[in-house]
Amino acid sequence: MAKRDYLKITDTTLAEAHRVLRLAARLKEEPKGRRTTMLAGRAIAVVLEKASTRTRVSFEVGIAQLGAQPVVLSTQGSQLARGEPIRDTARVLARYCDAIAFRTSSTARLLEMAEASVPVINALSDDGHPVQVLSDIFTIQEALAASGDRTGIAGRRVAFLGDCASNMARSWLEAAQLFDFHLVLAGPEGYMPPADEVERARKTGHVTITHDPREGAAGADVVNTDVWASMGHEAEAEKRRAAFAGWTVDAKVMARAAQHSIVLHCLPAHRGEEIDDETLEGPRSRVWDQAENRLHVQKALMLWLLGVELA
């Protein structure tokens, strides 16, 4: 079987993505902490060039639960800190491990890692966070099913409020085209994805752009947000707080969303900035389900990439 990577949402077909999501649902039904032998005898590397809580823990726990050996490397804990070329690291890891999950700020470095002869998963890069967005889609469909609606995300209205130039927003833009839902990108001027990415999505009728938070949330089935200053933008924090003044997802914003709407945030949250406590902890929030679902979706994705089927 030719090796497959998961570097962006569109690295699967729609049918393949739904297959991964169905597998994740089956894995979630297993008792918490149950270990299997599906990947017994294998090792999966998790290489972290950026600080991480949820990504590291969800991959490390998930790999162990599948019966494989997690090998976690940070930049400072490896020869990467001394300038070893990423392609050399990739070639060596591929001799030891069966797959690599890579969290980096550089898409160029991600593509170099993907030269490895084993599957490579984008665990975050500067222009995408596909494992998070795929997990979020799982969370949305799970919430819909819990309310008795099993029609899925297709045709839904998903709003992303905040920094629409972020890796999260850009993966949502790709996801809208693959999963056939309507994405509303709502953010201040100057904080939008590259024009060519927006134009591609607009041609398929899958995106609306607005610079008004309440207009962005209007009629939305899902209201999604993220931090205003991501890792790497700390020096711009004060500038961004000023630019995003009035963009907090709160009761006033949510009053414009559909009555059945849910709220997502990939965490960590800066409470009182992009989202307030009342909304984050309120009945519409699916944030904690969303965090858990990273574990199940990533396990399913690893099984799929390695060609392992559930019995």
From Swiss-Prot:
Query: Which catalysed reactions does the entry list for this protein?
Result: carbamoyl phosphate + L-ornithine = L-citrulline + phosphate + H(+)
One GO MF term: amino acid binding
Q: Which residues bind carbamoyl phosphate?
A: S52, T53, R54, T55, Q79, R103, H129, P130, V131, Q132, C266, L267, R294
Q: What class of enzyme is it?
A: transferase
Superkingdom, natural source: Bacteria
Coiled coil is among the record's keywords: no
Q: What is its EC number?
A: 2.1.3.3
User: Pfam families from the xrefs?
Assistant: OTCace (PF00185), OTCace_N (PF02729)
The residues listed in the UniProt record as binding L-ornithine, with positions renumbered to this chain, are: N167, D226, S230, M231
GO CC term (a single one) = cytoplasm
Query: Where is it located?
Result: Cytoplasm
The biological pathway it contributes to is: Amino-acid biosynthesis; L-arginine biosynthesis; L-arginine from L-ornithine and carbamoyl phosphate: step 1/3
Transmembrane parts of this sequence: none
BP terms from Gene Ontology: arginine biosynthetic process via ornithine; citrulline biosynthetic process; L-arginine biosynthetic process
Q: Main role? A: Reversibly catalyzes the transfer of the carbamoyl group from carbamoyl phosphate (CP) to the N(epsilon) atom of ornithine (ORN) to produce L-citrulline.
Concerning PANTHER family, the annotation shows: ORNITHINE CARBAMOYLTRANSFERASE, MITOCHONDRIAL, ORNITHINE TRANSCARBAMYLASE, MITOCHONDRIAL
Q: Give the similarity note.
A: Belongs to the aspartate/ornithine carbamoyltransferase superfamily. OTCase family.
Protein's name according to its UniProt entry: Ornithine carbamoyltransferase
Q: What is the originating organism of this protein?
A: Sorangium cellulosum (strain So ce56) (Polyangium cellulosum (strain So ce56))
Q: State the encoding gene.
A: argF
